[in-house]
From Swiss-Prot:
Annotated organism of origin: Gallus gallus
Keyword tRNA-binding: no
UniProt protein name: Cysteine and histidine-rich domain-containing protein 1
Residues that coordinate or bind Zn(2+) 2: 27, 42-43, 59
Protein encoded by which gene: CHORDC1
Function in brief: Regulates centrosome duplication.
Sites where the protein binds Zn(2+) 3: 157, 162, 176, 216
Length: 331
């Protein structure tokens, strides 16, 4: 004769004669529901879906239990003594409901025209070591270049957007088609400030032909710093927003990140002659004094402390919200 197991998380039928210490897999704890998350107090797994919660496999082995838990009794309470007795009758496995704290009042959005402050740059040991190696190699390259001013066949043009390479003296007479502006990344769209042909695809952006004509630049001496696009993303926790820029061997002495409560300006020089710029109107408000920048050999992380513990819908404030904010401030 099979019996129904009443252990939480089991619910299977079992044969009492074959019931052993590891026959049942169940939850010895109680259900916990907090901030839309559901789980058991005895294990760490959490889910927002109630069906998933019901299907969470037990975390403890033991005997099947055929004893049905007592139903909660609801007598007509008339005295304090009876209320106390009623509390004792309630099953011990009743779910725990944790009340969330009251929401904080929304902070009034400060003006974007507040003075900008340079965030503290924290340079890692790995970046310092990488820069020391690059310094030695660049010194050796400069000596070689001084010995020979000859341009090697296959040398790419240093102008942004130009894909031509040096094939001989006739290459210097060719017209160079390049982008004279800077790359701009805004609300998922990518374009150059000089021609503003917008696209959401990064490869299409890189393949856009230049909108300006001029002469090719073959050597670093003539090119100087070159503004280039750079992969970057962001993530957040309850109290912090982090922007990651994937630029190798950034130069701390030539780079800076400045911010006020609602604006972020990023200027990174990396790999010797490359530059990355990004200006962001932040979706939320940050605490500038508690924000900083971590610089490593492979990336830069801008850690911004939130002024209020709210989840941001995006990193950047949409244009419509910005205009609405300005209109409200004018009124």
């Amino acid at each position: 004769m099979s019996l129904l197991c009443y252990n939480r998380g089991c619910g299977q039928r079992f044969d009492p004669e074959t019931n052993t210490e590891d026959s049942c897999t169940y939850h010895p704890g109680v259900p916990v529901f907090h901030d839309a998350l559901k789980g058991w107090s005895c294990c760490k797994r959490r889910t927002t879906d109630f069906s998933d919660f019901l299907s969470i496999v037990g975390c403890t082995k033991g005997l099947h239990n055929s004893e049905k838990p007592p139903e909660p009794v609801k007598p007509d309470v008339k005295s304090t003594t009876e209320r106390k007795e009623l509390a004792e009758l309630k099953p011990k496995f009743q779910e725990h409901i944790i009340q969330a704290p009251k929401p904080l009042e929304t902070i009034k959005r400060p003006s974007p025209d507040e003075p900008m402050t340079n965030l503290q740059l924290k340079v890692s040991a790995s970046l310092k070591q990488a820069l020391d190696k690059l310094k030695l190699s660049s010194e050796n390259e400069e000596k070689k270049e001084e010995d020979s001013d000859e341009i090697k066949i296959g040398t790419p043009c240093k102008n942004a957007g130009c894909s031509k390479t040096y094939q001989g003296p006739h290459s210097t007479e060719e017209v160079c088609q390049y982008h004279s502006g800077v790359p701009i990344f805004h609300e998922g769209m990518k374009y150059w400030s000089c021609c503003k042909r917008k696209t959401s695809d990064f490869n299409t952006f890189l393949a856009q032909e230049g909108c300006t004509t001029g002469t090719h630049v073959w050597t670093k001496k003539d090119a100087g710093k070159k503004v280039v696009p750079c992969r970057h993303d962001w993530h957040q926790t309850g109290g912090e927003v982090t922007v990651s820029i994937y630029a190798k061997n950034s130069v701390p002495d030539l780079s800076y990140v400045e911010a006020n409560s609602t604006m972020l300006n990023i200027h990174i020089v990396f790999e010797g002659e490359k530059e990355f710029h990004r200006n962001v109107k932040l979706w939320g408000v940050i605490d500038v004094k508690r924000s900083y920048v971590n610089m490593t050999a492979t990336k830069i992380e801008v850690s911004m402390r939130k002024a209020e513990p709210l989840l941001w819908a995006s990193l950047e404030l949409p244009v419509s919200n910005t205009q609405q904010t300005n209109e409200n401030s004018d009124q």
